[in-house]
From Swiss-Prot:
Annotated protein name in UniProt: Gamma-glutamyl phosphate reductase
The encoding gene: proA
Disulfide bonds: none
Pfam families linked: Aldedh
Any single GO BP term: L-proline biosynthetic process
Homology family: Belongs to the gamma-glutamyl phosphate reductase family.
Taxonomic path: Bacteria, Pseudomonadati, Pseudomonadota, Gammaproteobacteria, Vibrionales
Keyword match Ribosomal protein: no
GO cellular component, one term: cytoplasm
HAMAP family, A to Z: ProA (MF_00412)
Amino acid sequence: MDLTVLGKAAKAASFQLATASTAQKNQALASMADQLEAQSASILAANAKDIALGREAGLSDAMLDRLLLNESRLQAIANDVRNVIKLNDPVGSEIDSRVLENGMSLARRRVPLGVVGVIYEARPNVTIDIAALCLKTGNAAILRGGKETFFSNMELVKVIQSALDKAGLPAASVQYIEKPDRELVTQLLKMDDYVDMIIPRGGAGLHKMCKENSTVPVIIGGFGISHIFVDESADLDKSVAVIENAKVQRPSACNALDTLLVHQAIAKPLLDKLIAKLNGKVAFVAEPKAKALMSSAAELRDAQAGDFDTEWLSYTLGVKVVQDVQEAIEHMREHNASHSDAIMTNDLYNAELFVNTAGSAAVYVNASTRFTDGAQFGLGAEVAVSTQKLHARGPMGLEELTSYKWVGKANYLSRS
């Protein structure tokens, strides 16, 4: 497979997309959503092949859950695409404007990035999310999904390209790297003549490889250890309910809870309530102070080196007792708290201290970490959750897939 051919086609498509009307882009999105429903049988059959091969390969339950499509999930994906149609098109909008002393009218206008390359793992929904957001913002996309989702992604890309064709837009607006060859990923990372941004969605290894090898700007998204700290002033029953939601609702999600930090003053009653709620559902990994208070837990083991740096993506929860909010924050800083973190507290000072000093992309007071999501934030689908500080941070929606240009208008003005 010659990626240069894909790159040239994507760049050419990006020029046409940049001038496409909102109506034309929305037409393609509507067709995409309709075809996801109309072609559900073939999409789910392809996904069943991926699931069967994944089981044969010994994929974890968490990975299989990420890979799985069913009628309800496919319907939710189609609905997400329709929600993108409802969102304002940022392309062409003015960020700000002013009139200079020399009479020039100067504005910053949003424009597409150009060509976005996305490398991701066993999440077929990402294929549609990225295509929808890139299309709405006038960006072409080159996608490279994991080999675990090959058959699913092939069917989804057919739907996307058919929708583009029906709307009179180039099929090369969304292209897929079919071969799982790692060398092709390395080649994509060097294609700065054609690709304007790379977004890797996966584990720390993928992020490291992209940062070390890419000549294209990279936005790191998805990986990070999510924490909840329960302060001594918190309502314990309500805190347990939030912890259960953050851990159990969908443990394979990147915003699911990984580590629970508990203030020493309320550690015993909080952990008793938590164990009563989660026994049989969650395996606990605890440091010595916490473990000494958790004898009633059905599944409990000592925390080992590296456990508090682990994104579990499963029904496993790290637990640590801390002295106060400051120790909780220090623990988070030492253990890659870059994604989503929360404090349960009724103390306004501690809440503000946590919000102002936690280094995460999304920080919550008395709310689950599970809210870090483009749809939950009202952004529509998301292309990634950025855990870095440039160029975007948190869920990357439409505006985060644009840049801007300066536009100056005058009456034949020359600089003096």
